[in-house]
Amino acid sequence: MLDMYVMVDGKKLRCGYTTGSCATAAAKAATIMLYNKEKLKTIDIDTPKGVRLHLDIEKINIGENYVECCIIKDGGDDPDATHGMEIWARAEKKDDGYTLKGGKGVGVVMGEGLYVAKGEPAINPVPRTMIESEVKSVLPKDRGVEITIFAPEGKKVAKKTFNPRLNIIGGISILGTSGIVMPMSEESLKQSVELEIRQKIANGHKDLILVFGNIGERKGMEMGLDQSKMVSISNYVGFALDCCRGNGVKDITLVGHIGKMCKIAAGCFNTHSRVADVRLEVLALELALMGYDIDLVKDVYNQKTTEGAVKFLGEGYDELYKRIAEKIAKRIEIYSYGEISPKILMFSMEKILFSE
């Protein structure tokens, strides 16, 4: 267990280590045991973060010309789908040189625009470098080794990750730019957003559909939007727009629930509740600007949620939602320096409020 902590919102949270670090440690340990003929209990590796990891070796299989061993992935206090997985490496003797392969449960990249070439195992560049460096540091002179990284539960676990959206088939990715999992980190989510945008562009899509998550994707499909153009952006509206602009995307459709959309209308481009919450303020202000009675404005403002406010208002407020959508579009145009032309699809849980 990694004894490293960070403070997030006043809470002490334990850090973990990436699948890339697990694969590196397993590969190094397997290589040592392959040529030294003795079992190890632990292994040390360096990480790009500058933290030296001391990891337990969970299981070992020894054959005539190969050794396999595994490290258990530990996500710390920010566990993802891969937390607790066995990440295995097989080291097999060869006459000379070093090669790296992906085995069972490690995905294969089937799309363009990712960090790894199409047809290659989904082992990202930093883990590839880490594995090669650590293995070569213990490989006897004039000896060779073939390393295969595999994860027996990878195919099942991958369904809970971004890999299906990124057209990575058959398993998980071996990831990590620092080797360390920082609790509550936005890095991995943002990286997935950027990768998905790049992949859509590489597949020939020049206009993209940005959704916040599964509900937005489903609503968009119900409205006839093309799923192959959809990018799930979580709360990172501004970051996604920056990625679109940086990759030459000129036209987007933003699909979202009125709660998150109201935040953008107010100029908030990170829609997480701990960053900003102006949902009811936007609705109340717009009603006031439209000249509605102050009692109605107060009633809307005092609702618990935007969903509740929409239900409270009932029918006959199409102009309200149109004005909010127009403000969202204007905010996006300003944010992107006029380089992105947006369309808006806004919904509540029960109905479409605005579509163009």
Swiss-Prot record:
Pfam assignment, any one: CbiD
Q: Which InterPro entries match?
A: CbiD, CbiD_sf
- Keyword set for this entry? Cobalamin biosynthesis, Methyltransferase, S-adenosyl-L-methionine, Transferase
Pathway-wise, it operates in: Cofactor biosynthesis; adenosylcobalamin biosynthesis; cob(II)yrinate a,c-diamide from sirohydrochlorin (anaerobic route): step 6/10
Q: Which reaction does it catalyse?
A: Co-precorrin-5B + S-adenosyl-L-methionine = Co-precorrin-6A + S-adenosyl-L-homocysteine
Q: Which GO terms describe its molecular function?
A: cobalt-precorrin-5B C1-methyltransferase activity
Going by the entry's taxonomy, the superkingdom of the source organism is recorded as Bacteria
Q: What does the record give as EC number?
A: 2.1.1.195
Query: Which enzyme class?
Result: transferase
Q: Which GO terms describe its biological process?
A: anaerobic cobalamin biosynthetic process; methylation
Into which family does the record put it?
Belongs to the CbiD family.
Q: Which NCBIfam families does UniProt cross-reference here?
A: cbiD
Designated name of the protein:
Cobalt-precorrin-5B C(1)-methyltransferase
Give the organism the record lists: Clostridium tetani (strain Massachusetts / E88)
Question: What gene name is listed for this protein?
Answer: cbiD
